Amino acid sequence: GWVKFCEYYYPELIGNLSSCKSPQQMMGAVVKTYYAKEKGLNPENIFSVAIMPCTAKKAECKRPEMNSAGHEHGNADIMDVDCVITTRELAQLIKSKKINLNNLADVKYDSILGESTGAGVIFGTTGGVMEAAIRTLYYNVTKDNPPEELLNWQSVRGLNGVKEATVSVPGVGEVSIAVCHGLKNARTVLKKVKNKEASWQFIEFMACPGGCIGGG
């Protein structure tokens, strides 16, 4: 949602966006490359479904550039993610099939990769991407685990529309950041950026109030 908003209303800023894809699209590419190879599957026979809180993810998976796996296999028609259903749609599907989750037997999670980190858990809430990114920056630069304050970084948490903070990273210096959720707040932040009234070096935007978990 945020990327589409920027493309429509602030196309001159597209070059400043992170080149990282969303976790949905990263996982889709992994499923049809690494997973397909590990399981001996033809990626053309894999139908990859993502379950997401955000309705905008449906459009994201259909973007023509979201076919990294297709390029890997020499078939541009292979999309990384074939279909997205929202968490609300999943709940409706479960109810329509009269499935009682409490009556289902526990089974072992068939993980193809390591289980998520703490940073992965908070990724979908406002401030979560920023917190994860700063922790990663700290580790990659210093080769040490982040200090306790970066593992419980209250400055970027909470539901204020725009949050600001400065963090010191050895070898980098002071990094000025902002966290914004809700597109009304995004306009306010981007106005400051365009008018050169802001000194932020890294800004997290999420379209929905509260972050991606507020979508759907």
Q: Over which residues does each language-model region extend?
A:
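Iron-sulfur-associated redox domains of electron-transfer enzymes in respiratory
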Residues: 1-216
